[in-house]
Every structure is written in structure tokens, then in C-alpha cells.
Amino acid sequence: MILLSFVSDSNVGTGEKKVTEAWISEDENSHRTTSDRLTVMELPSPESEEVHEPRLGELLGNPEGQSLGSSPSQDRGCKQVTVTHWKIQTGETAQVCTKSGRNHILNSDLLLLQRELIEGEANPCDICGKTFTFNSDLVRHRISHAGEKPYTCDQCGKGFGQSSHLMEHQRIHTGERLYVCNVCGKDFIHYSGLIEHQRVHSGEKPFKCAQCGKAFCHSSDLIRHQRVHTRERPFECKECGKGFSQSSLLIRHQRIHTGERPYECNECGKSFIRSSSLIRHYQIHTEVKQYECKECGKAFRHRSDLIEHQRIHTGERPFECNECGKAFIRSSKLIQHQRIHTGERPYVCNECGKRFSQTSNFTQHQRIHTGEKLYECNECGKAFFLSSYLIRHQKIHTGERVYECKECGKAFLQKAHLTEHQKIHSGDRPFECKDCGKAFIQSSKLLLHQIIHTGEKPYVCSYCGKGFIQRSNFLQHQKIHTEEKLYECSQYGRDFNSTTNVKNNQRVHQEGLSLSKAPIHLGERSVDKGEHTGNL
């Protein structure tokens, strides 16, 4: 094995030598042209019986004080061994820097280090006060304050303050992943990514919360967790002002306003805002219901649904409103309820600007603009926006009236109609007119009444321009122009254009009134036959 080193004559008179650089060559033509003399020394191979480890003085010259001459032909086929490498192997130290305390094998390395060091133990940044030992580190740090990014990526044009950061970034384009986990084989672009990943295997959690003691693998996870204690919500929605502790939660929330649903079911095409909702939806197609209630036998696809269902049997309502004390089985129902107190309506229709507190109401409302009617009656083919409307409609065909009044026995198709009817017995009239004090059982009746005070007649006949307060009167009036007569007298077969006129006709037969004295109803007014004197 042959060791090559370049030695320069620093003082010709004394013969003093100094190592300035060391390198290896496989080809004599690759040697630099230099004034330095080449010192060649034969070293014993590791296989030889007598192994001699020379001192640094022996590497720089002849042990007996005589210079070893050499010719260029002697270094053919030399191995890659340098003075620096040799000193690392033997552990011998040549020089110690008085400023940094570092050991250096070559005097040239020591000189380079001393040029880097600035006078004084710490060299602070004049902007932020951070201290650095080396001038090059301070220069790189100052670039970060200036915002200067002199290193630009050729692929995408992104700029960086340090060349090392550019080199790391370029691995994204090349796909190079130098750092490999020796446990699972996963590779990473950045060394920091490998270090963080290895904590998964080691179980190390160095980042601990000072408030509750919970520990985390990553500092970013700790920062997010601390917002639970501080209630900080730095990510704010520009549409509604709602704040979030994580940027990912803000991005997901913004889909409510944009209507974006990136997760689509391959089976039926239904799309979702969250990936978790899509995963839950997929089980509808597989029809797997593995969680069964022991009380009633009802089965569920998700364990969480079973737990919620069991609260019906136990009566447990763990989610309580702080404002009014009302309790709920589900947390989602509590969140919806709390919007009554806060007045929050986060779901905004892009078509008309109407706001909603619940996603279900918002989705249903959008069908008004799209004209989509998903729920169709099998009996008559009539379609509806809501499933509840279809269920209510189907009772017309079945004749089912499940809501019966306990006072009078009258039955109704809808629970809302029963509730309104019961106010007749209780005398409850919760809807009062602010102008005259008149009270009504139904809110719709109050709205109709208030039009009397405003004088508004929203229903205008397109034939004659006459206005009406109530839609029912407007529809009856239009039948005069269309000559539509839907109601027939059961005794004489006479046709009428309203149920009111049919009832009046029946009263004529029952009371034995002459047709000449029976009133004729025209629209909203009734005229006696005796008054037909040409004033009409």
C-alpha cells in the first residue's frame, strides 16, 4: 500500500516542511503541476507479519532525516489513503485550535478554521440576537432575515436561502430518498423525516404538554394539542368567521360554502365532504350489520350507532346544553341545538343567500333551485323534495289517520294538524297580531290576517287584474274566467266552481228555498236574484 502526500518548502534554508494538501491518483497524468515536492512512502500491507504505524514526522519525511526522492512512476496504482484518513485511523492529533478547541490533522484545515472564527466567544445577529460560532453560519442566517433566496430550483423555480435547502428540495423532483428506516424499510427525502418516523418504532415521545402531561412524537402535534387548553383558533373562515384550531379542519369546513364534495362513491355516485363519511357509506352497499342490540334485536353497521341506539333503552342523554339544560342522545344534536342560542347559520345557499343552521335543511332547500325530486309515489307517480312529504302523501292512498284527538276523536294524517286542532280544545292562541291584538291558532292564519292591515293583495288575476288577500279566493275567482266547474250537485247534477256554492245549493234543497230567492255566489260576493236589475 502506498501513501501519497504533498509537502511544500515553507523555509528553504531550514528545510522545514509543511503539509498543505493530500490526495490520491490512479493515473500519473492526473497529478497537478505544482511547485510542491511529492513525498512517497511505502507502507506495510495489513497482511504482512510486521505492521509498523509511522508517526506524523515519518509521513512528512525520512525518519533518519534524509528526504525520500521519488519519480512519477512510483505512484502508479496507488490506493486512496490520505494523511487525514491515516491520522483518523491512528488517532494522532497534529494541531489544536485555540478558539474552537477542535483537533486538526492538517495545518491547512487549522488555518481555514481560524479564518472562519470571529474574535469573541459568541457572534450575535444584529437583527434577532441569535449567536453563531462561525462566520459562514451567521451569513446564512442573515439571508433568512433579508428574505433573499439566491438558490433557485431549475425544475419549478422555487427559491431558497441556503444551497443545502435547495439540494433537499431537488430530491422531490428526482424522487431520491437517501434516508431509509432500518426497521420497516420506509424511505424519506429529509433526515428529519426519518428521525421523526423512527419514534413510531421506539415509542419515544419527547414533546410533552406542560398542562396535562400528554406526550407526542412530533412538535407539531404538541402545538395543535396545546390549542385545546388555550382555545386558540388561528384559522378563520372568511365566509362566516368561524375559527378552527387546525388548517385541515378549516379546509374541510370551507367545502360547506363551496359545495365541494371530493369523495365520491364508485357504486352509486353519491359524494361526500369527508373521507370518513364515504367509508361509512360504502357499508350500505355491502349490507353488513354486525352490531346487534340485545334489547330489541335491531342491527347496525357501526358500533357507534349501536351505542347511540342503546341510549333509547337506557334513557341516557349525556350531551347537555349549558344554556337551557336540554339533554340529547347524540353530540351532533346538541351542536345543532346550540345554534338556536347563538343564532349561527353556517350553511348559505349560493342561489338566494338563505342561511341554514343544519346541513339537512340546507340540502333540502337546494332541491328547490335544482328542481330535483328524489322521492316518488308508487301509487300515482307524484314526486317530492323530501321523504317526509312522500310519507305524508302516501297516507292519502292508504287512508291512514294515525293521529287522533283524545278530546273529540277526530283523526289526522299529520301530527302537526293534530297539534293545531288540539288548540281549539285548549283555547290556546299563541299567534297574536301586534296591530289589533287578535290571536290565532296557526301562524299561517296570523300572516293572512296581517295583510288586512298592510292592504297588500299578493294574488292578482291575470284576466281582469283583481287582487286577493288569500290564495284560495284567488283560485276560485279564476274559475269564473276559465268556466271550470269541478263541483256537481248530487240531486240535480248542476255544476259549480267552488265548494261554497255547492253547499249553498244543498241548503236551498234542504230548506226548500225557491231558486229565485237563493243567493248566487260570484267570486267573493253574493247577489240575490231579485237584485238583478241591470246594475251588474
Curated annotation (Swiss-Prot):
Q: Does the keyword Aminoacyl-tRNA synthetase apply?
A: no
Q: Which Pfam families would you find in this protein's record?
A: zf-C2H2
Under the heading Gene3D superfamilies, the entry gives: Classic Zinc Finger (3.30.160.60)
Zinc finger extent (C2H2-type): 123-145, 151-173, 179-201, 207-229, 235-257, 263-285, 291-313, 319-341, 347-369, 375-397, 403-425, 431-453, 459-481
> Chief location of this protein?
nucleus
- Superkingdom is Eukaryota
**Annotated region Disordered: where?**
57-77, 513-536
> What residues does the Glycyl lysine isopeptide (Lys-Gly) (interchain with G-Cter in SUMO2) crosslink join?
445
Enumerate the UniProt keywords alphabetically: DNA-binding, Isopeptide bond, Metal-binding, Nucleus, Repeat, Transcription, Transcription regulation, Ubl conjugation, Zinc, Zinc-finger
Q: Where is the composition biased (Polar residues)?
A: 64-74
What this protein is reported to do is described as: May be involved in transcriptional regulation.
In Swiss-Prot or TrEMBL terms, this protein is called Zinc finger protein 623
